[in-house]
């Protein structure tokens, strides 16, 4: 995991939706709504 990783603490739990739009993953949560996560040949982990 590098600088592109993020962590949600237990206080931030809630619905998470991830949409694939034009080669980008659009991640929507209570604290990340509308943020764009760009894939770079690795993986994205949501740690809850």
UniProtKB/Swiss-Prot annotation:
Origin organism lineage: Bacteria, Pseudomonadati, Pseudomonadota, Gammaproteobacteria, Enterobacterales
Species of the source: Escherichia coli (strain K12)
Induction and repression of expression: Expressed at high levels equally in exponential and stationary phase in rich medium (at protein level).
Source organism superkingdom: Bacteria
This protein's name: Protein YodE
Note: Overlaps on the same strand with small regulatory RNA RyeG.
Gene that encodes the chain: yodE
GO biological process: negative regulation of cell growth
Pfam families in the record: YodE (PF23504)
